[in-house]
Amino acid sequence: METLKSDLMKQNRREFIKTIAVAGAAIPFTSAVNAEITTPAVNRFPVRLFSKPLDAYDFGFMCECTAKSGIGGFDLTVRPGGKVEPSGVESSLPKLVEEAGKYGLAIDMMVSGIVTVSDPLTERVLKTASSLGITHYRLGYLEFDFKTGIWESLQKHKANLKDIVALNRKYNIHGDYQNHEGTRVGGPVWDLYELLRELSPEYAGCQYDVRHAMVEGANAWIVGMHLIAPYIKTLAIKDFTWMTVKGKPSTITVPLGEGMVNWDLFFRTVKELNISGPITLHVEYPLLETGEDKLPLLQKQEIIVKKLRKDVDFLNGFLLEYQIT
């Protein structure tokens, strides 16, 4: 009976996704982007686009693609090599926030390279971001010192993070550390509990990435999610599959629903643990195939928007099914 119920739920979701996808495709594609922009309703899980895949384009083009895809704004890269260089944050970031607003888009999340308050750019970035309405930012990555020891490394990083939290409190902004596959801090997920447990979740937390959690945690990832649930304040959404590269196992990011992430268990757990916060949609698979990069800009935009919409429709289907919007 439970299996039948599960199958029916999945079938209903597929039909829902198919319906909204067809409806989206029926919207005339026009350069008059304003006709397609709608202001997203305020909810517990506002969706933002991690800007990295589009950073190489003109910002106006980025805004058009994002607005046409039904995404409410950006999780903007404000880090070395990002859309905004930290050294020019005071002049560049306000302009982009203003321009995004013309498309009905918010910039209330950012991805930084911040790892210490000793860098003079740290306070400049946080002060500017906070003044512009950015409420959440992702911290830079931390490394384990295997010679010093794993536990000792965590204690060192904890002391440093306390100083960052003090700055977050000063500017009323929340800093999140993303769990990421590999041997850096956050890979195992449980280590983030030790890193965060003595800090206020109002100013420091985890940007929980279920894709990376499943890569490293296989069937046990759910344990780490339960452990750090009080500190999960933003969600990074993407999918993956395993493949063999030169005889070795490797992961590849794929469109949502085409990989191995257990979305039903993930969103059910999000609801059970009463987790809420902004969602950053990571589209880290090729948006343009070989040769498509040579197409006219408008044709590129059509291809990009179609792929973004597909991910957005998939995500919205789960948010609706589990009634956690």
Model-predicted segments: where are they?
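Histidine-acidic metal/acid-base catalytic patches
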Residues: 2-4, 8-11, 15-31, 35-46, ...
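Catalytic domains of carbohydrate-active enzymes, especially glycoside hydrolases
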Residues: 62-79, 132-133
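Active-site acidic/histidine proton-transfer and metal-coordination neighborhood
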Residues: 20-29, 61-63, 99, 103, ...
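Hydrophobic faces of well-ordered beta-strands that scaffold small-molecule active sites
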Residues: 45-51, 74-76, 107-112, 137-139, ...
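Active-site mouth loops of central-metabolism enzymes
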Residues: 46-57, 111-119, 150-153
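Active-site beta-loop-alpha junctions enriched in small/polar residues
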Residues: 50-54, 77-81, 112-115, 142-144, ...
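A short acidic, helix-capping loop that chelates divalent metal ions and anchors anionic groups
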Residues: 80-85, 145-150, 216, 246, ...
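Glycine-rich, proline-tolerant flexible connector loops at the mouths of alpha/beta enzymes
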Residues: 77-95
